[in-house]
Amino acid sequence: TSPRDKLAARLAASWSRLVCVHGEANAWPRHHPEREEPETVHWVAHRPATAETFEAVMAPRQALAQATPDHVEMSPERLRAGGTVQQWRDAWTGFTRPDDILVMWGAYYRDLAAGDGLPLSVPSINLRDEVSRLLRRRFGTVEASMDSLGAKPTLLALAGRGGRRLSALVGALESLRAPAPPEATTGRAW
């Protein structure tokens, strides 16, 4: 059995528990004189097995970095009108289940959200690490891996870069749930 088939079997066995997550931050350039620590301002999630989707926009708790609206692809007004961190935590607690397994692309936004107090003490899968092992190369973004995986983004009605990135993550996950096509096991290094 190929490594890809083993991953597909693992994902299929846990499919009902998988929740793809992505966050976006209000973050200043590292050496900016007004720099404060990054904070989560957009958190999105999707449960592929049931098509349940979660979205929370949190108002910045500190000064909005000048580049943040363009970076996260949301207007300053939308960001400033976001909810509180407590509202986000409460809504997230209502969305999650005790046996969830979070699926993310890298750990930065998960770690940032945990630092913001989001309860994330559940198992997780870093899909970037899994894809890097399978394809024997490192991908910076989930979008950069799509062609190599033969994946297409799953259309999700979510705003901004967070929505786009989550759509790509869900598409990548769905492509990996299927066993490798025959040509993948005979000619390529999986």
Regions found by a protein language model. Give the residues of each.
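Short His-Asn-centered micro-motif
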Residues: 21, 82, 104-106
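Metal-dependent phosphoesterase signature
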Residues: 70-91
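Short acidic/glycine-rich beta-turn/loop cap or linker motifs at sensory/regulatory domain boundaries
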Residues: 24-27, 49
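Metal-dependent phosphoesterase core characteristic of DEDDh/y 3'-5' exonuclease domains
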Residues: 11, 16, 33-42, 46-74, ...
